[in-house]
Amino acid sequence: VPKKTIIIKASDYRYPSRDELREVYKTNPDLHAFGYMSAYPMIALISMKKGIKEVHRDDHLQYWDRVLLNRNGMLSRTYYNAMVHYMRGFPDDESAFEHEHYINRIQFDQYAEIFYYHFSTVKDTLGQLLNVYYSMGFDVAKMFFKNVLAKIPDQAVSKAIMDFNVLTEITTEYRNSFTHRTPINYPDSRSTIDHTGDSLIYGSANHNFVKSSVIRDNMESTFIALAGLLDTLKMLLPQKIGGI
């Protein structure tokens, strides 16, 4: 049976409109950074109001907070774009696709995968910020989020992050699969081999995959959970640097 030919034109690609984005904005929270800033760090050092280590810490805290702000922005834009393309419509069952569904699915898949990458960078940036905030001393290149979590002295902060990790456990699995294993959004067409004693049994592919509707729901719950964590941590990690 001849396969169906789908032609996607450049004109089929449409960036989300203002009204479409506004519709997504209405139902989703904002991702906040912590607002750490010190207007005159060198003055504090020269006037001896602060020591070198404290000014150094303040500078790094501001840096990672700006990085967090930027990465929150990238994650948010990716999320909004994915949601718009999902809202434009396509069924989970590809056999039921009409022509306009293909471009919506292609665009959703693209932004969804990028979303999971940005989620990981936001989480790692938060780890870098906590490393500086609590003066843990982890080298930037050797910092792992789980190591930072283990050294957090504040139980309320630790609990907030552990609760977040539970809420986003599937998110992490999706991200790891996209990055290191098979893409979750397309059927796994690989054959299998089962070892039974001295025999090998060749098996057909299982064609398992995660439906777009399930990925969409996970993205939404992840975005809400991250916004909640950042708001909670902003209250638990008061601004401790000068010039505020």
Show where each model-derived region lies:
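Acidic, Ser/Thr/Gly/Pro-rich intrinsically disordered interaction regions
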Residues: 2-77, 91-92, 99-110, 128-244
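Hydrophobic alpha-helical segments and helix pairs
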Residues: 76, 80-83, 87
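Acidic, Ser/Thr- and Gly/Pro-rich intrinsically disordered linkers and low-complexity segments
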Residues: 86-94
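Extended HEAT/HEAT-like alpha-solenoid repeat tracts in very large eukaryotic scaffold/adaptor proteins
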Residues: 108-119
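Short, positively charged
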Residues: 122
